[in-house]
């Protein structure tokens, strides 16, 4: 019996989306090195890509469980700043991270590094894992730190 002719089965009419994906995974653990942007175009169901996503990147590690899992693709919109609580992709000390962004008042030993020319002490960025077995990463002003983008899924 032909299932399509019987109308008991309808093939998926959704066109696949073609989107860039960085093939080197970002760490959801202790950090993985991101060597430049190694993009490859992949095809995925269009409904799986959130509106505004500019690229995908694979997750490596368990520090963002239970929300994100190793091998999963997260969809990212490029940006240079995030709000506290946003999940993002970051480069810190030449390693790529998938973490929740937060900010803390720097301790006294670090305060001078976060003080601007007007004497205003700014908050210290902190990268937080969702898996509580991992400690937060306090961002040192002496290391390169970059917000790559916001995770949309």
Label the predicted regions.
Residues 11-19, 31:
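Helix-turn-helix/homeodomain-like alpha-helical modules used for DNA recognition
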Residues 1-14:
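Helix-turn-helix-like N-terminal two-helix hairpins of bacterial/phage DNA-binding regulators
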Residues 25-62:
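Short beta-strand/loop turn elements enriched in aromatics
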Residues 22-24, 130:
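Structured loops at beta-to-helix junctions and adjacent beta-edge loops in soluble globular domains
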């Amino acid at each position: 019996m032909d299932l399509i002719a019987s109308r008991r089965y309808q093939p998926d009419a959704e066109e696949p989306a073609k989107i860039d994906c960085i093939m080197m995974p970002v760490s959801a653990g202790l950090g993985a090195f991101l060597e430049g942007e190694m993009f490859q175009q992949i095809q995925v169901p269009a409904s799986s890509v959130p509106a505004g996503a500019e690229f995908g990147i694979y997750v490596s590690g368990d520090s963002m469980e239970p929300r994100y899992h190793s091998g999963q693709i997260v969809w990212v919109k490029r940006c240079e700043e995030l709000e506290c609580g946003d999940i993002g992709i970051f480069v810190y000390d030449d390693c790529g991270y998938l973490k929740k962004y937060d900010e803390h008042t720097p301790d006294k030993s670090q305060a001078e590094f976060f003080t601007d020319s007007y004497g205003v002490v700014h908050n210290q960025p902190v990268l937080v894992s969702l898996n509580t077995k991992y400690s937060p990463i306090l961002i040192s002003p002496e290391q390169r730190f970059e917000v790559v983008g916001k995770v949309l899924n």
